[in-house]
Amino acid sequence: MTMKHQDAFEQIAFGTVDMLPEGEMLARLAAAQRDNRPLRIKLGMDPTAPDLHLGAYVLLHKARQFQDLGHRLLFVIGDFTAMIGDPTGKSVTRKALSREEVVANAATYRPQVFKILDPERTEVMFNSEWLGALRPEELIQIAACYTVARMLERDDFNKRYSANQPIAIHEFLYPLLQGYDSVAIKADVELGGTDQRFNLLVGRELQREYGQKPQLVLTMPILEGLDGVQKMSKSLGNFIAVEDPPAEMFGKIMSISDFLMWRYYALLSRVPAVEQTRLQKEAASGARNPRDIKLDLAGELVRRFHGTAAAQEAHIAFLARFQRHETPEDLPLQAIKLSEAPRLSQLLVQVHLAASTSEAMRKMKEGAVRVDWRRVVDPATILALDAVYLLQFGKRHFARVALQKGE
């Protein structure tokens, strides 16, 4: 193997959890270079929501690294599988989306993913093209490739089965159809989160059954949300959306802990691994303030999604707030257990931002209250449980709270 192959391998390997089978990725990269045949890299996403958050961009960032090495990305929009619903990590059967919901969500994906991906090295596909055309006998043939016992090896299925909770037959079809996507597009490598490991390996098995060379599987970590504990999720409220306004995105990134900052660098930044190691040493020795390193990260990510001018404006605005002591940086996270979703006005009193609910409601009407950087003026606003919020009361008073279900 040449040094060039080794460098490419190290770039791809950085930040990954699994590269399966072990030891094959380097050889596959070298063979692609030798034969002048770009690898076909598969990345699939079900359009279950209209917008993406940075958790999805961990995979897109890794896909772009493959593209920069000359390989071709097959971006599969799971418009068919979204109507089944991915059971991964679910304790109950997931509600399937309608065709209309899927189409509406999918329409927003292209402009968002091409903020990262190279359009010249990307093929966008919809898996309804081949899954929707399957005849009943072909579906039976796919189902015959896997046993119920193998399906129950999945942790989520096994837990539900052991707890006597129902598992619908169509949920068993999901990993099979995701795996068949790899057969249909002849994937060489498939990318996915660690929670998708089982499904990705099903793709290898099906390719073998259909006489194809099995794909390699590369898994990436699940990105933690702003709380640094749970995975980034819209339902938990701890997310940074790709479409967040520049100042809001910048501020959210600056609100993460210094520890979590290195995680975001490793999974989202284009700063080389060697440079990241140097930055960590400088921060640990006191040679550089971690805040300044975090400013660089916030600037890089905002620039990627919104452009240089917007990133510069967001940077200047943040520093202006900081100099006036208006920044929420390094605020402690207050965990609050509640039996029901609270009114924002009551929560402001509970965290000692407002002296009374009447004061809180008055400030809301005046436009002096923000939640996650968004102004909230409706005094009747209720916040959902199992979510993390940044509260701002007036210009200088902030609180970070994690609302949890409890007594």
Curated annotation (Swiss-Prot):
It comes from the Bacteria. GO terms for biological process: tyrosyl-tRNA aminoacylation. Residues 342-403 form the S4 RNA-binding domain. A motif ('KMSKS' region) lies at residues 231-235. Signal peptide: none annotated. It is found in: Cytoplasm. Changing residue 53 to A: Does not complement the tyrS mutation in E.coli. One of its GO terms (cellular component) is cytosol. Its EC number is 6.1.1.1. Changing residue 306 to D: Does not complement the tyrS mutation in E.coli. It is an enzyme of class 6 (ligase). Changing residue 395 to N: Complements the tyrS mutation in E.coli very poorly. 17-fold increase in Km for E.coli tRNA, without effect on Km for ATP or tyrosine. GO terms for molecular function: ATP binding; RNA binding; tyrosine-tRNA ligase activity. CDD domains: S4 (cd00165), TyrRS_core (cd00805). Keywords: Aminoacyl-tRNA synthetase, ATP-binding, Cytoplasm, Ligase, Nucleotide-binding, Protein biosynthesis, RNA-binding. ATP binds at residue 234. It catalyses: tRNA(Tyr) + L-tyrosine + ATP = L-tyrosyl-tRNA(Tyr) + AMP + diphosphate + H(+). A motif ('HIGH' region) lies at residues 47-56. Changing residue 306 to A: Does not complement the tyrS mutation in E.coli. 3-fold decrease in kcat for amino acid activation, without effect on Km for tyrosine or ATP. InterPro entries: aa-tRNA-synth_Ic, Rossmann-like_a/b/a_fold, S4_RNA-bd, S4_RNA-bd_sf, Tyr-tRNA-ligase, Tyr-tRNA-ligase_bac-type, Tyr-tRNA-ligase_bac_2. Catalyzes the attachment of tyrosine to tRNA(Tyr) in a two-step reaction: tyrosine is first activated by ATP to form Tyr-AMP and then transferred to the acceptor end of tRNA(Tyr). PANTHER family: TYROSINE--TRNA LIGASE (PTHR11766:SF1), TYROSYL-TRNA SYNTHETASE (PTHR11766). Homodimer. Belongs to the class-I aminoacyl-tRNA synthetase family. TyrS type 2 subfamily. This is Tyrosine--tRNA ligase.
